[in-house]
Amino acid sequence: MIIKKISNLVRKKRHLKLRKKIIGTNQKPRLNIFRSNKSFYIQLIDDEKRITLCSVHSKEVDSKGLNITTATKVGELIAQKALAQGIVNVVFDRGGFLYHGKIEALADASRRLGLKF
């Protein structure tokens, strides 16, 4: 239990370091990812106006569990919603998570459909 708390604290510190460097605008919003034990939450955020442009939750896709298949479907869905709003360029905010596995699959799927970051 204590190991989980420490790893979550390290992730939060990593995310704070990242957030100091990246800012989303209206032309290039921030693609923010949060992964819990059971689901993904992805948002396109305009930090200047402090609004969410669009969001996707892993419950919106028809797959159970938190696996690479779900991450791929969620990445495709956020790309479709962004392209429908005319957003092509985004700033990728991995939320302090390591760029590996599910996060990498989500990023690759959204790139494949046309998002550029």
UniProtKB/Swiss-Prot annotation:
Pfam families reported in the protein's UniProt record: Ribosomal_L18p
Record CDD domains: Ribosomal_L18_L5e (cd00432)
Entry's Gene Ontology cellular component terms: cytoplasm; ribonucleoprotein complex; ribosome
SUPFAM superfamilies, A to Z: Translational machinery components
Keywords per UniProt: Ribonucleoprotein, Ribosomal protein, RNA-binding, rRNA-binding
Superkingdom as given in the UniProt entry: Bacteria
Coiled coil: none
GO MF annotation list: 5S rRNA binding; structural constituent of ribosome
Biological processes, Gene Ontology terms: translation
Family recorded in the similarity comment: Belongs to the universal ribosomal protein uL18 family.
Stated role: This is one of the proteins that bind and probably mediate the attachment of the 5S RNA into the large ribosomal subunit, where it forms part of the central protuberance.
HAMAP family (UniProt xref): Ribosomal_uL18_B
Subunit structure: Part of the 50S ribosomal subunit; part of the 5S rRNA/L5/L18/L25 subcomplex. Contacts the 5S and 23S rRNAs.
UniProt protein name: Large ribosomal subunit protein uL18
Organism: Phytoplasma mali (strain AT)
Underlying gene: rplR
